[in-house]
Amino acid sequence: MRERSHPKLYWVDPGLVRAAKRQLGPVGAEERGALLEGWTLTVLRAHNEQSDLFEELSYWAPVQARETEVDFLLRKGKAYLALEVKAQPRSSPRQLSGLRAIGDLGGVVRRLALYLGNQRLRTEDGIEVWPLQAFLDALKNHKLWP
């Protein structure tokens, strides 16, 4: 499987983007996804500094599917953890297409979607859907990897 090669850019502080654009009011719906992804990256990097959470962090986007991607792909040894971030209060099957597609990649031990809802869910094909608090708890307790 070939992956697209263009990089994904994140600001160190997602609030800097808003300030640079002079968006000083309430966060708009169109901004929430990017801000939540940036926040998630910051949290992952901070935990990696303290506990060697991963050896490599990237994102995944196959060449053959333009609309398919996974926000974060963590590698530890030969194991991969795929993480998709959704700034939505509900999970839908359409939001999980990237996690479904990456299931064909060898070595993926967990496919995880984060969302703004309150329930932990699991799809029939094994994708786990967690609220943000469950993600933070897993990081704190060193349980992100299965």
Task: Pin down the residues of each PLM region.
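Active-site ExK catalytic segment of metal-dependent nucleases
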Residues: 75, 80-90
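Intrinsically disordered, low-complexity Ser/Thr/Pro/Gly-rich regulatory segments
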Residues: 24-25, 44, 77-78, 106-109, ...
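Flexible, glycine-rich phosphate/dinucleotide-binding loops
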Residues: 18, 66, 91, 120, ...
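Short, charged, amphipathic alpha-helix that recurs within catalytic cores of restriction-modification
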Residues: 88, 93-107, 111
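Short beta-strand/turn micro-motifs composed of small residues
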Residues: 86, 114-117
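Accessory nucleic acid-recognition modules appended to NTPase machines
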Residues: 1-78
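Domain-level recognition of nuclease-like catalytic cores that cleave nucleotide substrates
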Residues: 117-146
